[in-house]
Design a protein with these regions (language model features):
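Extracytoplasmic gate region of multi-pass secondary transporters
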Residues: 65, 244-294
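Extracellular/periplasmic helix-loop-helix junction of adjacent transmembrane segments
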Residues: 65-95, 280
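Cytoplasmic helix-loop-helix junction between adjacent transmembrane helices
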Residues: 139-176
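Helix-loop-helix hairpin linking two adjacent transmembrane segments in secondary transporters
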Residues: 174-216
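Cytosolic juxtamembrane N-terminal segment immediately preceding the first transmembrane helix
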Residues: 17-18, 22-59
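C-terminal transmembrane helical hairpin of 12-TM major facilitator-type secondary transporters
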Residues: 304-354
Length: 432
């Protein structure tokens, strides 16, 4: 009897011990909120919001490019001194990419994007109120944080909403928000500056704040992010594992940032200072070459879905090399304008492939941080492009300065992209 009682007690204890963990092991985790795919209409709103965010961000940046000499005159500084404000903006962009990219990967894309848009809008208005050269530099540095945060978050949100077969085309559309922003800045220079001065152009830059209302009302959270939802440990692990890829992309984006900023930032100043053109002619040429930029981005973005990302980028850069003499050396205004149109068709054609290429090469757990940081580290390394060209121009003229920089970085960009990897059309979701 005692033996049977002991066996029964022991059996009961074993049952109690063994079933306790089983009771919790079979309960599935409850998600914070249900995951659902975007509808086509929601994907359209997402693409439009991301495009508009990058467009207005670029507008706020390029406003300064058109009024460098005028701000210099007001603050009694040289063009090179004011061009240093561009360097400050570009140099601070990685900080914005790190901050808002981390927030976007950790907490979702929508809210960080709205905060970022508000930040750069407010700082842009304050730039128009700057009383001194020093305060202007500080504000342009703060603006760089906002500008740096927008690209990685917006591009990740947009590319995660697009079907793989259309990713290249919509990559070109998204990236050419940059050219459209440049075009709008040229239009503001044409219509606003002659009547109200350079400060009014910065005041217009506060308009993007209204975009936050649209994002809040129409743009859902990314499905790809909802399925991943990485914690702090997963983010750090993914960054460490993919460090070689990050270093490669940073080097590649350094060359590409020199391609873009080296052909754009000082070109209006070249037209004004060396070719003797007035504000209206400068604005007209800028509008035309930015139309070329938009067309190039859409064309090469679409072609990259057929040819591949690397081949499309390299082709645009190689053709661009042969356009340089016409771009800076044409004698007539008509030919100079045509050269500028072709140049930006190729430059932004190559850059139009970048959002898709970076999104496909970035780990899903850290796409916002990884792609944004690689992009902005490249920008940081090229932050002195305008300042460098201004210094070279003081000795050899703007045409030679632009040409030397352009031919060098076009060759480097084509070589680097062809040496790198490619995942054209690959899934942007975390693989099980």
């Amino acid at each position: 009897m005692k033996t049977k009682r002991r066996d029964a007690v022991a059996s009961t204890r074993r049952i109690e011990y063994n079933t306790r963990p089983m009771a919790t092991a079979n309960i599935p985790p409850i998600p914070a909120e249900p995951i659902r795919a975007m509808t086509p209409r929601e994907a359209g709103h997402t693409l439009f919001a991301s495009f508009l965010g990058w467009t207005l961000d670029a507008f706020d940046f390029f406003v300064l490019v058109f009024v460098l000499p005028k701000i210099g005159a007001d603050f009694h500084r040289s063009v090179a001194d004011i061009a240093f404000a561009i360097t400050m903006t570009l140099a601070m962009r990685p900080i914005g990419a790190a901050l808002f990219g981390w927030l976007a990967d950790r907490y979702g894309r929508r809210t960080p994007l709205m905060i970022d848009v508000l930040l750069y809008s407010v700082v842009e208005v304050l730039s128009g109120l700057a009383p001194t050269y020093g305060s202007f530099l500080v504000l342009r540095a703060l603006y760089g944080i906002g500008m740096g945060g927008e690209w990685g978050v917006g591009a990740s949100l947009a590319m995660e909403a697009v079907a793989p077969k259309w990713r290249g085309f919509f990559s070109g559309l998204l990236q050419e928000g940059y050219a459209v922003g440049y075009l709008l800045a040229a239009a503001a220079y044409f219509f606003v500056y002659p009547h109200f001065g350079w400060r009014a152009m910065f005041f217009i830059g506060g308009a993007p704040a209204l975009l936050t209302l649209y994002i809040r009302a129409k743009v859902p959270e990314s499905e790809a992010w909802q399925r991943t939802r990485p914690d702090r440990t997963a983010i750090l692990r993914a960054l460490k594992k993919n460090l070689p890829m990050f270093l490669y992309l940073s080097v590649f984006l350094t060359a590409m940032s020199f391609v873009s900023h080296g052909t754009q930032d000082m070109y209006p100043t070249f037209l004004e200072k060396q070719r003797g053109l007035g504000p209206h002619h400068v604005a007209e040429i800028a509008i035309i070459y930015n139309i070329g930029a938009v067309m190039g981005g859409l064309f090469f973005g679409y072609v990259s879905d057929k040819w591949g990302r690397r081949r499309s980028i390299a082709t645009a850069l190689i053709i661009g090399i042969f356009i340089i003499p016409l771009w800076i050396g044409a004698r007539s205004i008509a030919l100079l304008t045509f050269g500028a149109f072709l140049m930006q068709f190729m430059v932004q054609g190559a850059f139009g492939v970048i959002p898709a290429h970076l999104s496909e090469l970035s780990p899903p757990e850290v796409r916002g941080l990884f792609s944004g940081m690689a992009y902005q580290v490249g920008v940081l390394m090229a932050a002195n492009a305008a300042f460098l060209e201004a210094l070279i121009a003081e000795r050899w003229g703007f045409a030679n300065a632009l040409g030397i920089v352009a031919v060098t970085v076009f060759v480097l960009g084509a070589v680097i992209v062809m040496l790198g990897p490619e995942r054209a059309g690959g899934s942007l979701h975390l693989e099980a």
